Amino acid sequence: MYSFVSEETGTLIVNSVLLFLAFVVFLLVTLAILTALRLCAYCCNIVNVSLVKPSFYVYSRVKNLNSSRVPDLLV
């Protein structure tokens, strides 16, 4: 059977294609990890805004109200 390219050239082409595919897979995996981290940060921000900040506001508000009432109780 006749070959259009030599064995060395064919091996070089195949290795180049496989290296390119490995690079593309690496980029996709990296992109997926970065997207997951961004989603995690977004969800943490939602938890912070919806749970932590209101809880801290209520805590500090009650603490201020209680600290202003303490002298009245001592009198």
Curated annotation (Swiss-Prot):
InterPro entries documented for this protein: E_protein_bCoV, E_protein_CoV, E_SARS-CoV-2
Membrane topology: Single-pass type III membrane protein
Gene Ontology process terms (BP): disruption of cellular anatomical structure in another organism; symbiont-mediated perturbation of host cell endomembrane system; viral budding from Golgi membrane
Main subcellular location of this protein, as a coarse class: host cell
PROSITE patterns hit by this protein: COV_E (PS51926)
Motif (PDZ-binding): 72-75
Location of the region described as Disordered in the Swiss-Prot/TrEMBL record: 61-75
Gene Ontology CC terms, in alphabetical order: host cell Golgi membrane; membrane; virion membrane
Domain of life, per lineage: Viruses
Intravirion side: 35-75
Entry's localization field: Host Golgi apparatus membrane
Entry keyword set: Apoptosis, Host Golgi apparatus, Host membrane, Membrane, Transmembrane, Transmembrane helix
Consequence of substituting P71L: In strain: Beta/B.1.351
Pfam families on file: CoV_E
Subunit structure and binding partners: Homopentamer. Interacts via C-terminus PDM domain with PDZ domain-containing host proteins such as PALS1/MPP5, TJP1/ZO1, LNX2, PARD3, and AFDN/MLLT4. This may lead to disruption of tight junctions between epithelial cells. Interacts with membrane protein M in the budding compartment of the host cell, which is located between endoplasmic reticulum and the Golgi complex. Interacts with Nucleoprotein.
Summary of the function given for this chain in its UniProt record: Plays a central role in virus morphogenesis and assembly. Acts as a viroporin and self-assembles in host membranes forming pentameric protein-lipid pores that allow ion transport. Also plays a role in the induction of apoptosis. Regulates the localization of S protein at cis-Golgi, the place of virus budding. May act by slowing down the cell secretory pathway. May interfere with tight-junction stability by interacting with host MPP5. This would result in disruption of epithelial barriers, thereby amplifying inflammatory processes.
Family label: Belongs to the betacoronaviruses E protein family.
Name this protein carries in UniProt: Envelope small membrane protein
Species whose genome carries this gene: Severe acute respiratory syndrome coronavirus 2
Encoding gene (name): E
